[in-house]
């Protein structure tokens, strides 16, 4: 497991950064998407427009 930052942009133009432990970039994006959908990431937007993971 490595640590990743995941940048998320919502339909309202909000830019959020989420920190997660994952196996690779795709896994980090998947975990961040799940956290977003479960309401663990607080924001006004309800839809992800773009998502990008990179190693911390």
PLM features: what roles do these ranges have?
Residues 1-15:
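Short aromatic-glycine-(Arg/Gly/Cys) micro-motifs in beta-strand/loop hairpins
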Residues 3-4, 18, 36, 54:
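Aromatic side chains
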Residues 14-24:
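A short, exposed loop/beta-hairpin motif centered on an aromatic-Gly-Thr core
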Residues 34-56:
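Short, mixed-charge low-complexity intrinsically disordered segments
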